[in-house]
């Protein structure tokens, strides 16, 4: 609790910096809507395997990235529990959640509109994965702060690489836009972690060591993740 209070001025400063440089964007701008067709329920045609796009590796990465983003309610619960909903911490929790919410919306629209993957299997996977939820490996404020610092960086890299793997300029543009969000989130958490090192160096280093030693992406439990 003391560290949360001690970091509050840093959170406020970093939140103001973040808001000043974050660029507003809209998921619908990145979706090729002219490629969309109705499915059978509305008189069109249901998806067939012949319609799938991209390499197997790119499709798997897109699905895993989306399912990972879909678990946002669990992530929100985790960070709201750790950081609280009051003051600058609470403002950041709300801002972070709102920005992250765009990612799943945009990726799902892209995959469904382009018919790149089976939308029925995708929805079934979403239902299963969200019911499983997410729980932090190491509890506690410092452990959580350390974990998200590394996780946001890894997520940025994952989205960027997946965009390149699609070979589709539209898909790459979308995932690059999402990666920019993740990069700003990483910088926010990294700067807080730097401040924590100044205030509680020993405890923070222990948390960093644990995060690096036991690191796993939020979506590590998804079927096919290891591929």
Language-model segments: residues:
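Non-heme di-metal
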Residues: 1-227
């Amino acid at each position: 609790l003391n560290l949360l209070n001690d970091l509050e001025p840093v959170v406020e400063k970093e939140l103001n910096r973040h808001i000043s440089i974050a660029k507003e964007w809209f998921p619908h701008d990145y979706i090729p809507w002219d490629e969309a067709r109705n499915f059978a329920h509305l008189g069109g045609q249901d998806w067939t395997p012949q319609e799938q796009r991209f390499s197997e590796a790119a499709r798997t990465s897109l699905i895993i990235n989306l399912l990972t983003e879909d678990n946002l309610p669990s992530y929100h619960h985790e960070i709201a529990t750790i950081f609280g909903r009051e003051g600058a911490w609470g403002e950041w929790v709300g801002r972070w959640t709102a920005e992250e919410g765009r990612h799943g919306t945009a990726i799902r629209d892209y995959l469904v509109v382009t018919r790149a993957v089976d939308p029925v299997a995708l929805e079934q996977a979403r239902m299963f994965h969200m019911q499983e939820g997410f729980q932090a490996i190491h509890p506690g404020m410092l452990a959580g702060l350390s974990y998200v610092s590394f996780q946001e960086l890894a997520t940025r890299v994952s989205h960027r690489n997946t965009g390149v793997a699609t070979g589709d300029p539209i898909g790459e543009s979308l995932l690059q836009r999402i990666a920019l969000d993740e990069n700003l989130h990483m910088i926010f958490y990294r700067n807080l972690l730097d401040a924590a090192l100044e205030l509680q160096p020993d405890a923070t280093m222990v948390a960093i060591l644990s995060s690096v030693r036991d690191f796993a992406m939020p979506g590590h439990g998804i079927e096919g993740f290891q591929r």
